[in-house]
Amino acid sequence: MCGFGLVTSRFTFSYKMIYTVHTFQKLPISLQQAWDFMGDPKNLSVITPDSMGFNTLSGDDRKMFAGQIIIYTITPLFGLKLQWVTEITHVQDKHFFVDEQRFGPYAFWHHKHFLKEIPGGVEMEDIVHYKVPMGILGRLVHPFLVKPKLDEIFAYRKKKLVELFGEFKTERV
């Protein structure tokens, strides 16, 4: 691989200005329960902070399927209301799905959601590749506005999922 990489926390910066968020979470539920929850677009509002002003406009009336278009509004910063159009591009039942932004606040957004059965529950893995808009200005505000907002969103989601399903307990030997 050519280029350079600077890693801070769970975000990666590359010479092409594509950033990466990579998170893991274990929950004490079955793979089927996790899939049923994560595969229902209505639940996105449940695991999104209220401060984001998340509101689904269309596309959440069915379980997730490849080709599904979901349209919603968000208010991520400074009270600015934005429309976000997402397409579910890939689905493998009880294993993974991919959502990609078609129109919205990012220059690029590709989010892979993986589910894996583990002893005592399920492990969820998220890999998001994204690019901020507005060229150099976007890159300058990324560490002060975009990255902290994404940190907040994923931390809220993790906390909310624990509230809903309980904390995963690791057995000590």
Located regions from the model:
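Short, surface-exposed coil-to-beta transition loops
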Residues: 20-22, 81-85, 108-111
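Hydrophobic ligand-binding cavity/cleft-lining segments
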Residues: 13-65
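A short, structured loop/turn motif at beta-sheet edges
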Residues: 31, 89-96, 114-123
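Beta-strand/loop substructures that line and gate deep hydrophobic ligand-binding cavities in soluble
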Residues: 101-152, 172
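Beta-strand elements of well-folded, non-transmembrane domains
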Residues: 27-29, 76-78, 90, 105, ...
